Amino acid sequence: MTTELHDDASGRLIVGLDVPTIAEAEKVVEELGNAVSFYKIGYQLVFAGGLDFAKSLVAARKKVFLDMKLLDIDNTIAKGVENVAKMGVSMLTLHAYPKAMRAAVEAARGSDLCLLGVTVLTSMDNADLREAGYSDNAETLVLKRARQAHEAGMGGIVASAVEAQAIRQAVGPDMAIVTPGIRPAGSEKGDQKRVMTPADALRAGASHLVVARPIVGAPDRKAAALAILKEMRSIGRS
């Protein structure tokens, strides 16, 4: 398993295809053209034929982040990861539980699949964690899971950019830190609670930024993507 961190902004911006149909996803990709090279596919699109669409994106020389947030018994995780590795996608998420991560890392060994451990969803805050039965606050739990992901040999983690600086200090320079909840200045937060602008996220130590609604929901999607890329390039590599 390798972790490819891009200096070029176009390789660090991941557009979330959070749309209901393959036809709409195809339209987004067509409109964005060569401006975007990396796409995230999650549950909504997976259940509408998104796995085949992921393969078509790979065939078109695009990179794919398959956001499945896997969590199961070790053997089931391993068998699933083995098949995902054969698809040619670049990234796959699973929840950052030590046994699951160790099984996934072993299953992906020898492939180019970058495994990402999901720490705490960016839609959750401390009150949500307490309601779910966790005694740790968000930052404490994120750092704990980030260290566990590093120890398990994962390629990176998914976390809010709010915690990115602390994570980078904890795990060093080589792990990918993939940050959802990215909102350009003036954008609506939507259902995200721990958000940051693209520039601030990169300054904090994020390696990849996941942006969905601010691009996919924009009247001019390509212009929105190019504006974010311009902001990212103005910062350079953190």
Swiss-Prot record:
Catalysed reactions, as listed in the record: orotidine 5'-phosphate + H(+) = UMP + CO2
Pfam families on file: OMPdecase (PF00215)
Protein's pathway: Pyrimidine metabolism; UMP biosynthesis via de novo pathway; UMP from orotate: step 2/2
One of the record's GO molecular function terms: orotidine-5'-phosphate decarboxylase activity
SMART domains: OMPdecase
Alphabetical list of CDD domains matching this protein: OMP_decarboxylase_like
Amino-acid positions noted as binding substrate in the UniProt annotation, renumbered to this chain: 18, 40, 67-76, 122, 183, 192, 213
E.C. code: 4.1.1.23
Active site: 69
Record GO cellular component, one term: cytosol
UniProt keywords, alphabetically: Decarboxylase, Lyase, Pyrimidine biosynthesis
Example GO BP: 'de novo' pyrimidine nucleobase biosynthetic process
Transmembrane segments: none
Function: Catalyzes the decarboxylation of orotidine 5'-monophosphate (OMP) to uridine 5'-monophosphate (UMP).
Complexes and interactors: Homodimer.
Family: Belongs to the OMP decarboxylase family. Type 1 subfamily.
Name this protein carries in UniProt: Orotidine 5'-phosphate decarboxylase
